[in-house]
Amino acid sequence: MQKRLKQLFWAGFCLVWGWIVLNSVFRWRHNGPAALAVGAVLAAGAWALSRWVLPRLNGLSQRRWRAVFYTAFALYAAAFAAMAWLLAEVPIMDQAVVLESLPDLLAHGRFSVWSGYYIVCNNNLGLALLLGGWYWLAGLFGLAPDASLTGVAPGIALNVLALLASVALLCLLARRILKTNAAVALTFLLCAAFAPFWLYSPCFYSDTLSMPFGLLALLAFERWRREARPARRLALAAGAGAAVFFGYAVKGSVVVIAVALAIQFFLQTNPRRALASLAALLAAFGLLAGGYRLWQRAWLIDWTDEEALALPVQLWFCYGSHDDGNYSQEDYEAAMSVDTVAERKTLLNRRITANYAAYSPLELGEFVTRKAVITWGDGLYNAEEFLATPQRANWTHAFILEGQPGYMPLVYYCQAYLFMVQLLVLAGAARAVRRPVGGPRMLAGVSVTGLILFLSLWETKARYAFNFTPFLLLLAAAALLEPPAEES
């Protein structure tokens, strides 16, 4: 039964992912087939590396292997940090507002003059608290949050650490799941060549700072499925729930991993143990979420103007229900035309219902496909928006600024690399239909599927998928290697 369920999942994933890949190629605003051809060449090169070059690393002793890997990672980290400093940008949009609000938090231990913003954009509160704690430490060295180069330097450092931690966790997962030195090396190379990691290195925002938490949840699950002792299994399930909560507090979409974990618990063990693990996960998540909400209500924010300012979550679903699914000033003004939160919910629910009722089945399919392509088919993940406001002039402007000589080659490289990853993920899923795999690989696949479904309804932006790119890179690496027998 479990084997059949795995086959059905991977078959469904193939259909959905294949449709996204196909439409990403033919709807790309430039030459999609050319980028696909380059992506196929890159995939062939990665396959050749995984077959004939990297397996030689499996013969190294653990001491020599660690020396090689740690040296390579240290060089990568140094280059990554240097690039982040060169790419330093003037914060824009909500990132700028969050940074501007931090002195209020640091001065009072809560938000006073900025309470109104966090009533409206409560989703950014977790980001503000994370940055606030980090800038408190930076303040010990005389650094304060502002839009200057020295003011953003601590944020850039935190972001670099988060991205490097994500790469390290991904390599650790490759070791745990795929077992070999070659698998770790392949995963590391896929990450090192993934340009959006470099491009987002100076942008300390929720898309990057939430990334390690999803991987920690995946790592906890990988350890959970191997643990025989009941108490430790429950502790690991609770740890996974805690990791999901902290990721969710920074970026709400991370919560889909909790649903994927619940599904995997029941696929991995008997119902009694699965229920116990699910209870531990929900208890950890629920206690943390409840405490977080209570802290907001009791201390962090002045909620006096809640009825006048608060925006219900339905607004973002309303944005995602028409046109290209992006921000709509008309929706926002309609929501603010009524006086209470309850009235806004009712009004927005009516607008959402009316928007979807206006589509024929074919129109709805076209609309959802268009949203999926915007979200999953952009090789830059909207990085160009943040890089368009550099702090100072340097040689990187030759490729990060639109209209410069290196900009279009960068765009084509990023798109070709995305197509390579998409093709490898599709190939791995197709192989999993014939030889079903579960465990962390299936958890990654179910999590990506959950995000696809969620973002088909939510406001549409390519960067909203960015914090799940490590899951795609893990699936791509696994597609190039034979899965261990125990994972099947």
Please give the residue ranges for each predicted region.
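Membrane-interface anchor segments at the N-terminal boundary of transmembrane helices
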Residues: 17-20, 24-25, 29-39, 150, ...
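Extracytosolic helix-loop segments that constitute the early lumenal/periplasmic catalytic or substrate-binding loops
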Residues: 96-120, 126, 325-330
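Transmembrane-helix signature of polytopic, membrane-embedded enzymes
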Residues: 167-193, 439-442
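Short acidic/glycine- and proline-prone juxtamembrane loop motifs at membrane-interface regions
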Residues: 196-210
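Short hydrophobic/aromatic helix or loop-helix immediately within or flanking a transmembrane segment
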Residues: 100-103, 117-150
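Start-transfer (signal-anchor) and selected internal transmembrane alpha helices
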Residues: 1-82, 277-282, 483
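Transmembrane-helix motifs of polytopic, lipid-linked glycan transferases
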Residues: 154-178, 216, 424-430
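Membrane-proximal stem/loop segments at transmembrane-domain junctions that anchor or position
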Residues: 108-112, 297-393
